[in-house]
């Protein structure tokens, strides 16, 4: 049971443009965005459509062969009652990369209020999409429901990465109370190709340290990443990837082919710094040296 002092000092997300305020209620943020890429007649990849509203914005760095879209949450984070939705499409024969400007922070929520983020991605024939957001950081007493749905054409390619951090280790935060429900689903030509779900209610640290989950580490697991590569190059990537995976007491990873041209990797780490030490070389390789610059800032 949280003490009064905990409630008084718990970090609160500041109000921002896009917040919706009801009488007697704290501000709630709403954000919607849609982006799509296309291949022009001259062969260049360009922005096709763009819609954005509320607290979810998109930026477009230049100087890349693909279209890179960087999402920005102007609310400064997510808390209970917030609602965000993103849709993106890589048009036929185009390449689209999506990332976040910074790590997404999920703050303390009030009782019976849950923040939501829904993402829907589609990849058309001979197109490639890279979904490489930076970490999502879950705070003590946060409540967050997240879903990611991907639709792939028969010959479309996908690199999907979802890093997750459990609490602020440097501040000694222990996630003994939170609600986190996460779902990833990938379909190819209408058929389910991959499905993954995480459900943590209550003491997340106690659940994570159980054998068969993240108990392989010497201490608490406070960071993890899920990676999926759907590409004809998946089998060749697997052999190299296994040489890069850590197998120690501070970080541990595994990778396998779930089906032809479908690679899945999971990596656990003591903290987000250790996670990045293992993850960045992998992402550099799988993105052919074109990982978005915001990952280095």
Curated annotation (Swiss-Prot):
Keywords: Chaperone, Cytoplasm, Nickel insertion. The keyword Oxidoreductase does not apply. GO terms for molecular function: nickel cation binding. Pfam families: UreD (PF01774). Belongs to the UreD family. HAMAP family: UreD. This is Urease accessory protein UreD. It comes from Ruegeria sp. (strain TM1040) (Silicibacter sp.). The lineage of its organism: Bacteria, Pseudomonadati, Pseudomonadota, Alphaproteobacteria, Rhodobacterales. The gene is ureD.
């Amino acid at each position: 049971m949280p003490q009064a002092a905990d409630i008084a000092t718990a970090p609160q997300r500041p109000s921002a443009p896009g917040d919706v305020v009801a009488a007697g209620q704290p501000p709630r943020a709403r954000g919607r965005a849609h982006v799509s890429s296309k291949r022009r007649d001259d062969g260049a990849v360009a922005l096709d459509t763009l819609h954005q509203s509320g607290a979810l914005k998109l930026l477009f760095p230049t100087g890349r062969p693909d279209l890179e879209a960087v999402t920005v949450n102007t609310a400064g984070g997510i808390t209970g009652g917030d609602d965000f939705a993103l849709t993106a499409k890589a048009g036929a024969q185009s390449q689209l990369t999506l990332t976040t400007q910074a790590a997404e922070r999920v703050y303390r929520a009030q009782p019976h209020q849950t923040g939501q983020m829904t993402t829907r991605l589609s990849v058309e024939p001979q197109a490639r999409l890279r979904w490489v957001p930076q970490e999502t950081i879950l705070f003590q007493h946060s409540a967050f429901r997240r879903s990611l749905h991907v639709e792939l054409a028969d010959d479309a390619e996908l690199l999907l990465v979802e890093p997750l951090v459990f609490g602020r280790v440097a501040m000694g935060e222990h996630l003994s109370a939170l609600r986190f429900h996460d779902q990833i689903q990938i379909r190819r030509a209408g058929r389910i190709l991959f499905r993954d779900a995480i459900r943590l209610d209550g003491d997340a640290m106690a659940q994570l340290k159980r054998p068969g989950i993240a108990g392989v580490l010497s201490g608490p697991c406070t960071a993890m990443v899920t990676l999926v590569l759907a590409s004809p190059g998946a089998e060749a990537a697997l052999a190299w990837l296994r040489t890069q995976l850590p197998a120690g007491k501070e970080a541990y990873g595994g990778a396998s082919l779930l089906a032809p041209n479908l690679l899945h990797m999971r990596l656990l780490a003591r903290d987000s710094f250790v996670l990045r030490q293992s993850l960045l070389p992998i992402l550099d390789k799988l993105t052919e040296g074109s990982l978005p610059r915001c990952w280095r800032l």
